[in-house]
């Protein structure tokens, strides 16, 4: 959102697609230890994306899912979803 850069894929996605999605965002350098900062837990972001993809696949009533913000901690330390909005299909 900060960089006005988002990435979308149709579910389900696997780990390789998740990795490519992450690498395609403008802020990717910030996740890799830019200017001496610690590396972010990119593997956890991958796991989160794959898990959310499976959640949406298993629950077709989910129309839209928005996580904002997602706080990514240092490598091996995970990530925290601070807020999530799930929009369901109206019948």
Could you describe each region identified by the protein language model?
Residues 1-91:
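ATP-dependent carboxylate/acyl-activation modules
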């Amino acid at each position: 959102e900060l960089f006005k850069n988002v990435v979308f894929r149709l579910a389900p996605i696997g780990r390789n697609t998740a990795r490519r999605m992450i690498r395609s965002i403008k802020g990717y350098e910030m996740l890799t230890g830019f200017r001496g900062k610690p590396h972010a837990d990119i593997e956890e972001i991958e796991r989160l994306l794959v898990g959310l993809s499976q959640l949406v696949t298993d629950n077709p009533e989910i129309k839209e899912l928005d996580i904002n913000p997602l706080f990514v901690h240092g490598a091996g330390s995970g990530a925290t979803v601070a807020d999530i909005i799930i929009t369901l299909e109206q019948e």
